[in-house]
């Protein structure tokens, strides 16, 4: 009888916890003080909060870039232009041009998205619990709360980058799974730079 009561208590705890996880995953994206769309020339490369003008951003970004960075979308696997891109340089946020990742930490994880085992500086990204569910299966999340993912955003403009997982290589054991649509590459040697090639794709899907 006691075991049965404990089981019911655990079930109720999980159910009531889910709305809190959803609220946590949304609260920062609704903050208007974290938005930016102005030209890169007016910005330095520090993680200072900036304001995003959504209308100007729609004009500057492609539909896929906008959906990924502003609506937390996800490009289809193996379609991003940086998935198999290994030139030496730095990957910046496509929205505010802050340096986020280095080619030195990029590796082929086989997941279909650009993968890095570290960021240039921990202060340049923010991490958030992501309770969004591929396919909308909330019962799956209730049964397996450990599947709640960790979302990665740009600390300066709050743009969605992707997610980070604990299955990467040493020494960090991290896998920053990043959308190509959320970043742009700056070559260490512009003279040897070649444009990345992207596979044509439809609209992003909310799955990563």
From Swiss-Prot:
Xref: SUPFAM superfamilies: Mss4-like
Gene Ontology CC terms: cytoplasm; cytoskeleton; cytosol; endoplasmic reticulum; mitochondrion; nucleoplasm
Cystine connections: 111-177
Pfam family, one: SelR
Reaction(s) this enzyme catalyzes, per UniProt: L-methionyl-[protein] + [thioredoxin]-disulfide + H2O = L-methionyl-(R)-S-oxide-[protein] + [thioredoxin]-dithiol
Cofactor note: Binds 1 zinc ion per subunit.
EC number: 1.8.4.12
Outcome after substituting residue 96 to G/S: Loss of activity and zinc binding
Organism: Drosophila melanogaster (Fruit fly)
Protein name: Methionine-R-sulfoxide reductase B1
Function: Methionine-sulfoxide reductase that specifically reduces methionine (R)-sulfoxide back to methionine. While in many cases methionine oxidation is the result of random oxidation following oxidative stress, methionine oxidation is also a post-translational modification that takes place on specific residues. Acts as a regulator of actin assembly by reducing methionine (R)-sulfoxide mediated by Mical on actin thereby promoting filament repolymerization.
InterPro entries, sorted: Met_Sox_Rdtase_MsrB, Met_Sox_Rdtase_MsrB_dom, Mss4-like_sf
Gene Ontology biological-process entries: actin filament organization; actin filament polymerization; axon guidance; chaeta morphogenesis; protein repair; response to oxidative stress
Known outcome of mutating residue 93 to G: Loss of activity and zinc binding
Binding site residues for Zn(2+): 93, 96, 154, 157
Region annotation (Disordered) ranges: 27-48, 189-208
């Amino acid at each position: 009888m006691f075991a049965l009561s404990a089981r019911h208590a655990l079930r109720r705890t999980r159910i009531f916890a889910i709305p809190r996880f959803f609220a946590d995953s949304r609260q920062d994206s609704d903050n208007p003080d974290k938005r930016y769309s102005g030209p890169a020339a007016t910005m330095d490369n520090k993680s200072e909060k900036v304001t995003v003008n959504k209308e100007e951003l729609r004009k500057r970004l492609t539909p896929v870039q906008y959906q990924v960075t502003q609506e937390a979308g996800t490009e289809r696997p193996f379609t991003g232009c940086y998935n198999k891109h290994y030139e030496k340089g730095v990957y910046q946020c496509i929205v505010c041009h802050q340096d986020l990742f280095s080619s030195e930490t990029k590796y082929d994880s086989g997941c279909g998205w650009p993968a890095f085992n570290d960021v240039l500086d921990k202060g340049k990204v923010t991490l958030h619990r992501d309770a969004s569910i591929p396919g909308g299966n909330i019962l799956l999340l209730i049964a397996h709360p450990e599947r709640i993912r960790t979302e990665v955003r740009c600390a300066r403009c709050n743009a969605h980058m992707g997610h980070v997982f604990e299955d990467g290589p040493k020494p960090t054991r991290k896998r920053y799974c990043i959308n190509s649509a959320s970043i742009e590459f700056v070559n260490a040697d512009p003279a040897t730079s070649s444009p990345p090639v992207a596979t044509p794709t439809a609209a992003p899907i909310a799955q990563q």
